[in-house]
Amino acid sequence: MNLLPKSSREFGSVDYWEKFFQQRGKKAFEWYGTYLELCGVLHKYIKPREKVLVIGCGNSELSEQLYDVGYRDIVNIDISEVVIKQMKECNATRRPQMSFLKMDMTQMEFPDASFQVVLDKGTLDAVLTDEEEKTLQQVDRMLAEVGRVLQVGGRYLCISLAQAHILKKAVGHFSREGWMVRVHQVANSQDQVLEAEPQFSLPVFAFIMTKFRPVPGSALQIFELCAQEQRKPVRLESAERLAEAVQERQQYAWLCSQLRRKARLGSVSLDLCDGDTGEPRYTLHVVDSPTVKPSRDNHFAIFIIPQGRETEWLFGMDEGRKQLAASAGFRRLITVALHRGQQYESMDHIQAELSARVMELAPAGMPTQQQVPFLSVGGDIGVRTVQHQDCSPLSGDYVIEDVQGDDKRYFRRLIFLSNRNVVQSEARLLKDVSHKAQKKRKKDRKKQRPADAEDLPAAPGQSIDKSYLCCEHHKAMIAGLALLRNPELLLEIPLALLVVGLGGGSLPLFVHDHFPKSCIDAVEIDPSMLEVATQWFGFSQSDRMKVHIADGLDYIASLAGGGEARPCYDVIMFDVDSKDPTLGMSCPPPAFVEQSFLQKVKSILTPEGVFILNLVCRDLGLKDSVLAGLKAVFPLLYVRRIEGEVNEILFCQLHPEQKLATPELLETAQALERTLRKPGRGWDDTYVLSDMLKTVKIV
């Protein structure tokens, strides 16, 4: 039998409630939770000796249960004569001090300041069915009466689903009256499923509006939220922020409900925040593997990503997480990323902190009392040391951090906080610095902290392994030098390069150190990045390495002049990112691949030179357009896709006759590598130039 109204308008009609209680008979209808679910909030805000008015009491057992645990002075009112008669008959003998009155709550007959608490369980929700003028006037009369019959210091305690229009009305009304406003989420309410809505469970909230004595001229407003797991309420700056916080709790309840019902939600992620500061502490991704055959022990697992490794493909990309989940062999895997700026004591502490929350995301059909394993790499939480934080006027907030990789080597990273899952620049640290960091970690095991200035090497440049390229797209770009004529002679002849986009400086620095006759112009629009590269990534200028602080568009345009430019660069490299995340192409900015600008690039490239472009484009239509534009200016175009990333490296040349077949290209790459691998010169043994070019295709 469907006892919840099909239309919200029915909530406000006397006829509906008369019919409702006649159908229900003497069976209690515990709308919005039972006493056991609400008692924590009720006992927190109502004292046993206080005089309590319950408005819209219905046939709920709530008043009876409060009476039985010591709350004697309770008056119940309802608009339904049927229910008042029922409740009087039920309680006349067993609860003689409790009274039931048929009364309209918009026109109550009690004297002013008669009660210390007005308790409302779903009544405001039943009345405020829409925002039409007639409805709002009725609600205004109801809330005005609540304020009239309450004493100063008294509380209006309203149990509600906190729909947006209801929260707005209640908070707005009482905050204008100078009352303190608190919203308290009822513990475990997200597990309650309304009979009429089996597909969704709404969380239940308690509004606690405390009546203050009016202070003429005072504009003080107090808004607080007390989430169920918090020990103390959090003060919020405005009614709007309070509404947002409530909505976040509702959205989380919806998400949990859908995940319990095998709903296909696609990629699901959420942040778990510090209850006191509101700062994100964990980022969770829910990954389902429908192909995994269910068994008792493979329903659900939690994977803790070691600090600093959340940007790796396996943990930071949807496809990588799917691969991780499939290899782990669980129906549902939740990956957990730890945030910089937060302190984590140990894996055990993280597990204890997460256990209750992650169980709300468990899949349907998981056996009760089943142990859920916590997984990780290496068995610890990893190492992340924030070395420096600052803000660039052009790039925004950024952070320099040292992290430990899976081989126990340490890496230094530049990350823009506007896109914190992308490593902007990365360099490997030398082993002596790694050992220092390891000792520091042992010293600070009980409490992690950012490195102090005195902990840093005296000469930051000496801490960087300049022979090692961390970024796969940088390795591919260097391998593209094999397209130049006579690559085995490149160490002996002058080589002019233009690099647009400095970042941490790893790319131009590698060329500078491995090609002793090279002369490099690096163009960087953001002066802060030059400081970062110099202070933290071992970069330095010399007579062969010059940095120009300028917009790459303007710099190349000035060289191209009026179209009569003299070719001056053997190699031009674009490794420049876009600051606009809405474009579908994050590298380079669109202006860098417009045909008019590409003509300028062409004019400063030597006839046998190579133009190398790092392209990061998720919009397939836009990518096709970029490739067509490049092909129109540079007839010979190679593409090398970076596995596991969106990056594609484009090698552009001016003459089709320069084309090299794959065997010839691999042979020249091997010849170049033999030249670079000289005794006494550092070289990463895992870096094989010819491997970088095996998958190159001609467009």
Curated annotation (Swiss-Prot):
Signal peptide: none annotated. It is found in: Cytoplasm; Nucleus; Mitochondrion. Protein N-terminal methyltransferase activity is inhibited by GTP and GDP. Changing D575A: Loss of activity. Residues 436-448 have a biased composition (Basic residues). Changing V576A: Decreased activity. Its EC number is 2.1.1.-. Changing D577A: Decreased activity. The modification N-acetylmethionine is found at M1. GO terms for cellular component: cytoplasm; cytosol; mitochondrion; nucleus. Keywords: Acetylation, Cytoplasm, Methyltransferase, Mitochondrion, Multifunctional enzyme, Nucleus, Phosphoprotein, Transferase. The modification Phosphoserine is found at S267. It catalyses: L-lysyl-[protein] + S-adenosyl-L-methionine = N(6)-methyl-L-lysyl-[protein] + S-adenosyl-L-homocysteine + H(+); N(6)-methyl-L-lysyl-[protein] + S-adenosyl-L-methionine = N(6),N(6)-dimethyl-L-lysyl-[protein] + S-adenosyl-L-homocysteine + H(+); N-terminal glycyl-L-lysyl-L-glutamyl-[protein] + 3 S-adenosyl-L-methionine = N-terminal N,N,N-trimethyl-glycyl-L-lysyl-L-glutamyl-[protein] + 3 S-adenosyl-L-homocysteine + 3 H(+). Pfam families: Methyltransf_25, Spermine_synth. Changing D551A: Decreased activity. One of its GO terms (biological process) is methylation. It is an enzyme of class 2 (transferase). Residues 433-459 are annotated as: Disordered. Belongs to the methyltransferase superfamily. NCBIfam families: MFS_SpdSyn (NF037959). Present in the circulating blood plasma of cancer patients, particularly in ovarian and non-small cell lung cancer patients, may potentially be used as a biomarker. It is linked to METTL13 unregulation may be involved in tumorigenesis. High METTL13 expression has been observed in pancreatic and lung cancer tissues, correlates with overexpression of dimethylated elongation factor 1-alpha and is associated with poor clinical outcome. The disease mechanism involves dysregulation of mRNA translation and enhanced protein synthesis to sustain growth of malignant cells. Forms a tripartite complex containing GAB1, METTL13 and SPRY2. Within the complex interacts with GAB1 and SPRY2. Dual methyltransferase that catalyzes methylation of elongation factor 1-alpha (EEF1A1 and EEF1A2) at two different positions, and is therefore involved in the regulation of mRNA translation. Via its C-terminus, methylates EEF1A1 and EEF1A2 at the N-terminal residue 'Gly-2'. Via its N-terminus dimethylates EEF1A1 and EEF1A2 at residue 'Lys-55'. Has no activity towards core histones H2A, H2B, H3 and H4. This is eEF1A lysine and N-terminal methyltransferase.
